[in-house]
Amino acid sequence: MAGRELSHLQQLEAESIQIIREVAAEFDNPVMLYSIGKDSSVMLHLARKAFYPGKIPFPLLHVDTGWKFKEMIAFRDAQAKKFGFELLTHINPEGLAQGINPFDHGSAKHTDIMKTQGLKQALNQYGFDAAFGGARRDEEKSRAKERVYSFRDRHHRWDPKNQRPELWRTYNGAVNKGESIRVFPLSNWTELDIWQYIYQENIELVPLYFAAKRQVVERGGQLIMADDERMKLAEGEQFKEEVVRFRTLGCYPLTAAMHSEADSLEKIIEEMLLTRSSERQGRLIDSDQSASMEQKKRQGYF
């Protein structure tokens, strides 16, 4: 009897689970980076499947900045309680003491200190030799050329010219002390794949992904939501209520909403089939400077 042919999503799922299991077996101290977004939620679901009925054998790490949406933090804590995984959180103490924020210091400095440096601090503190990330190759041009096993030096820097071949899904995880590998199990997934898998598997998400009436201010052609009293308005700016949703999530002053009526997974998938805009057009950190993402990754950003 001929074997049943796997669907496209089943093939992606099997590949990702194999990568997750390989890392858990090969590395001494792996960690899964948990940004609370849709890709992280899919990656968490895959990790749970990979080791079911046992628990995930490595911790999840959230690098906080102090500026995430309140709904993201509430969702993070609820997921940790529901599934019982080990959750580590880290916020850059020096940046916190200096009061680094995206309004007074700009997106580039805020991202470097609170995200990149904060991540490197956490990786050094716990001595992780492998870190899972939810990045996908279709997201952005610098991520398109990143390996599944992305080698990082002792300073957590990425050199695109110093990467290893990955033939026939064979990965090289050899590292010296202090070096590490960033692992991207979702490399071959697309944004549409992610949404279709979320629908298929009934994966919970932060409600911000779904359209609803929200208070936003238009700034530089982008819609920024007021998430707390720290939101600063420029002269002439005022809040207005709009039906919007978020296609991607991050620090709320640096993450733009989009007009949308998609308040269900079915409607979001339909919207994805018709859209011609970039997924990350709402991430203000990507427009800091030319080739911004690649420069951030060279400095240690995930």
From Swiss-Prot:
E.C. code: 2.7.7.4
InterPro entries associated with the record: PAPS_reduct_dom, Rossmann-like_a/b/a_fold, SO4_adenylTrfase_ssu, Sulfate_adenylyltrnsfr_sub2
Disulfide bonds: none
Reactions it catalyzes: sulfate + ATP + H(+) = adenosine 5'-phosphosulfate + diphosphate
Keyword terms: ATP-binding, Nucleotide-binding, Nucleotidyltransferase, Transferase
Keyword Manganese: no
Molecular function terms from GO: ATP binding; sulfate adenylyltransferase (ATP) activity
Organism superkingdom: Bacteria
Pfam families named in the record: PAPS_reduct (PF01507)
Known pathway: Sulfur metabolism; hydrogen sulfide biosynthesis; sulfite from sulfate: step 1/3
Any Gene Ontology biological process: hydrogen sulfide biosynthetic process
Region of interest called Disordered, as start-end residue ranges on this chain: 280-302
Role: With CysN forms the ATP sulfurylase (ATPS) that catalyzes the adenylation of sulfate producing adenosine 5'-phosphosulfate (APS) and diphosphate, the first enzymatic step in sulfur assimilation pathway. APS synthesis involves the formation of a high-energy phosphoric-sulfuric acid anhydride bond driven by GTP hydrolysis by CysN coupled to ATP hydrolysis by CysD.
Subunit structure of this chain's protein: Heterodimer composed of CysD, the smaller subunit, and CysN.
Family membership noted in the UniProt record: Belongs to the PAPS reductase family. CysD subfamily.
Designated name of the protein: Sulfate adenylyltransferase subunit 2
Organism: Shewanella baltica (strain OS155 / ATCC BAA-1091)
Record lineage: Bacteria, Pseudomonadati, Pseudomonadota, Gammaproteobacteria, Alteromonadales
